Swiss-Prot record:
Family: Belongs to the SHMT family.
Cofactor: pyridoxal 5'-phosphate
Organism this protein belongs to: Macrococcus caseolyticus (strain JCSC5402) (Macrococcoides caseolyticum)
Positions annotated to bind (6S)-5,6,7,8-tetrahydrofolate: 117, 121-123, 241, 349-351
Catalytic activity line of the entry: (6R)-5,10-methylene-5,6,7,8-tetrahydrofolate + glycine + H2O = (6S)-5,6,7,8-tetrahydrofolate + L-serine
A GO BP annotation: glycine biosynthetic process from serine
Descriptive protein name: Serine hydroxymethyltransferase
Top-tier EC class: transferase
EC number, as in UniProt: 2.1.2.1
PROSITE patterns documented for this protein: SHMT (PS00096)
HAMAP family, per database record: SHMT
Matches recorded under InterPro entries: PyrdxlP-dep_Trfase, PyrdxlP-dep_Trfase_major, PyrdxlP-dep_Trfase_small, Ser_HO-MeTrfase, Ser_HO-MeTrfase-like, Ser_HO-MeTrfase_PLP_BS, SHMT-like_dom
Example GO molecular function: glycine hydroxymethyltransferase activity
């Protein structure tokens, strides 16, 4: 980064400090990960200079013959990974991917069935403060109060009652396997289209560790970071019958020129996802998550739904007589990064919460193993039991640094 330091020392210092934070902290935010050096190099390449409105071999600008190669590679690799009929890799984010699907599949005011945000859904699945909840009539399904798992019978009853035009499966804080085949059966019964937002689990699906929604859904959206371990961005997979409509909705519908440097980074990440190493990585992600959940349970913390089948879990911190807000701050003080998160049937506000959400993609990328998960669980329990005790927090900082120093970032 010598050029940045010479040109703009303020930005250089901020980047340097952020690198130190990432290197010295244990990153447990479930939606974060560490991309490879190759992905970063692609995103910082000369492709950032190129405008390429349109699609490969159908551009509105000249000089696109090489960026066409990159976008074709990205699309072909996704087709191979997921068995997709059609792919659009141009969405700048998962939210824009979702917006494009809504505008293709729905008319303003149409009814949509999606997962309640407070039960593990996503902002773009009908939150009243999001465009989705403003433009469409969302009806929410949630989890069963006892099992804290999706009750497909209730989903079916809601679908029969409200006759949605679109049903959305997928979540941002749901730790169990989602039955896409059952969602498809429900959608077919009521004449709805099915969209799956697999942003959190795309890497697990690619590795064969979670059922693939592509054969069942009309549309599948995802981010390209998180478990897929690519650059920040979005993507849409759809049936061939919707291909032209989806492409037209992305460009010129809601976006202009694609970010070709990001698409290059996506292509590199998708290539990595096709390797045996990537599958082994995802297996370790799941193993680490299960180990961490079990160890936290042994320490007296309650995991929502009783455990995890994937990379993520929500922890109910009320048994320690604290809020999610307090837990997030106390853990951050010692170098463990999490996020406060509502849990099903939460009595606290989204700004306070009764839980925190944690995940294992980032720490697994660094090389953390099951023994590290047990130590992390012990640190978390100690800190949450004594969130204001400076002696406990000092000891926790030392233990955190001992772990992170074993796995230096980008070294």
């Amino acid at each position: 980064m010598s050029e940045i330091k010479q040109q703009d020392n303020q930005v250089f210092e901020a980047i340097t400090k952020e690198f130190e934070r990432q290197d010295h902290h244990i990153e447990l935010i479930a939606s974060e990960n560490f991309v490879s050096k190759a992905v970063m190099e692609a995103q910082g390449s000369v492709l950032t200079n190129k405008y390429a409105e349109g699609y490969p071999h159908r551009r509105y600008y000249g000089g696109c013959e090489f960026v066409d190669i990159v976008e074709d590679l990205a699309r072909d690799r996704i087709k191979e990974l997921f068995g997709a009929e059609h792919v659009n890799v141009q969405p700048h984010s998962g939210s824009q991917a979702n917006m494009a699907v809504y505008r293709v599949a729905l008319k303003p005011g149409d009814t949509v069935l999606g997962m309640n945000l407070s039960h593990g859904g996503h902002l773009t699945h009908g939150s009243s403060v999001n465009f989705s909840g403003v433009d469409y009539n969302f009806v929410a399904y949630g989890v069963d109060k006892e099992t804290e798992k999706i009750d497909y019978d209730v989903v079916r009853e809601l679908a029969r009652e409200h006759k949605p035009a679109l049903i959305i499966a997928g979540a941002s804080a749901y730790s169990r396997i989602i039955d896409f085949e059952e969602f498809k059966a429900i959608a077919d019964e009521v004449g709805a289209k099915l969209m799956v937002d697999m942003a959190h689990i795309a890497g697990l699906v690619a590795a064969g560790l979670h059922p693939n929604p592509v054969p069942h859904a009309d549309f599948v959206t995802t981010t390209t970071h998180k478990t897929l371990r690519g650059p920040r961005g979005g993507m849409i997979i759809c049936k061939e019958e919707y291909a032209k409509a989806i492409d037209k909705m992305i460009f010129p519908g809601i976006q202009g020129g694609p970010l070709m440097h990001v698409i290059a980074a996506k292509a590199v990440a998708f290539g990595e996802a096709l390797t045996a190493d990537f599958k082994a990585y995802q297996q370790q992600v799941v193993l680490n998550a299960k180990t961490l959940a079990d160890a936290l349970t042994e320490k007296g913390l309650r995991i929502v739904s009783g455990g995890t089948d994937n990379h993520v879990m929500s922890i109910d911190v009320t048994s320690f007589n604290i809020t999610g807000k307090v837990a997030e701050r106390a853990l951050d003080d010692v170098g463990i990064t999490t996020n406060k998160n509502t849990i099903p049937f939460d009595k606290e506000s989204p700004f306070v919460t009764s839980g925190i959400r944690i995940g294992t993609p980032a720490v697994t990328t660094r090389g953390f193993n099951e023994e590290d998960m047990k130590e992390i669980a012990s640190i978390i329990a100690d800190v949450l039991a004594h969130p204001e005790d400076e002696n406990v927090k000092h000891d926790a900082k030392v233990r955190v640094r001992a772990i992170t120093e074993k796995y230096p970032l980008y070294k």
